[in-house]
Amino acid sequence: MSKTTIIERIWPAKEIIEDLSELRKQSPLTHVITNIVVTNWTANVLLAIGSSPAMVIAKEEAGEFAKIASGLLINIGTVTSNDAITMKIAAEAAHQAKIPWVLDPVAVGALGFRTELAKELLNFKPTVIRGNASEILALAGTDGGGKGVDSTALSSDALPLAQMLAEKTGAVIAISGEIDYVTNGKETISISGGDPIMTKVTGVGCSLGGVIASFLGVQKDPLRATASASAVFAIAGTRSAKISKGSGSFAVNFLDQLNLLSTEK
């Protein structure tokens, strides 16, 4: 059971509209260090919401660039030894420069190298940690029961430990699932929506980390920024699924729906 009251936030709540409007106005420069499977898709998703993505991954440049970005995403999905160096450099630079950053610990707990890397990255105080229930449970120190990048646990199952992890790390924890939960340990927001077909298009979940990083660049309250990003993602998924014949048309429609979301009151 959750130890805090859960507040539901869905599109078109006032806070979400305001945050998306501000994002489109500012077009925040978002530094993305992500896995090779989803790089192109993530860039297109960020462009669709109005952000300015930059995929700077050279270890010689990552620290310098992280300091001038509005937000940073580090996703360890296809991490290599060289990638790990880049990630630690960027995370440290963002931490020193007080740039908000998101850690997406893909498949943490399933494999040793990435699990140790994720724990090292926690030293640089991520603003937000986003993952599925199994990943969050594993990062919190329990057996998440995941199978690679997929979760075998419900997001609600992970919520109590997510709240503890938030208090321990100081990060906002975002758990993706049939219902998304966002918590700072004291406050918890639920976001419903989306569609199961979102799990059938590679990169959809990973790109949410970039969307959160973009919202962090314009909304200084990380709990609110993460909830707004998740709600925008959910409504675009819901609307796209209704007009799609399958995963191929969904991918195109999802980008369109992100782009077409109206912030007019």
Swiss-Prot record:
The protein in question is named Hydroxyethylthiazole kinase
Give the residues the record marks as binding substrate: M55, G203
- The parts of the chain that form a coiled coil are none
Name the gene for this chain.
thiM
Pfam families, per database record = HK
Keywords of the record, alphabetical order, are:
ATP-binding, Kinase, Magnesium, Metal-binding, Nucleotide-binding, Thiamine biosynthesis, Transferase
Q: Which InterPro entries match?
A: Hyethyz_kinase (IPR000417), Ribokinase-like (IPR029056)
Q: What is catalysed by this protein?
A: 5-(2-hydroxyethyl)-4-methylthiazole + ATP = 4-methyl-5-(2-phosphooxyethyl)-thiazole + ADP + H(+)
What is the top EC class of this enzyme, as a single word? transferase
What does the record give as cofactor?
Answer: Mg(2+)
Q: Which GO terms describe its molecular function?
A: ATP binding; hydroxyethylthiazole kinase activity; magnesium ion binding
Pathway connected to this protein: Cofactor biosynthesis; thiamine diphosphate biosynthesis; 4-methyl-5-(2-phosphoethyl)-thiazole from 5-(2-hydroxyethyl)-4-methylthiazole: step 1/1
List this protein's GO terms for biological process.
thiamine biosynthetic process; thiamine diphosphate biosynthetic process
Family stated for the protein in its record: Belongs to the Thz kinase family.
Keyword Disulfide bond applies: no
Q: Which residues are listed for ATP binding in this entry? A: R130, S176
Keyword Magnesium in record? yes
Q: Which superkingdom does the taxonomy of this entry point to?
A: Bacteria
- Under Enzyme Commission nomenclature, its number is 2.7.1.50
The task this protein performs is described as: Catalyzes the phosphorylation of the hydroxyl group of 4-methyl-5-beta-hydroxyethylthiazole (THZ).
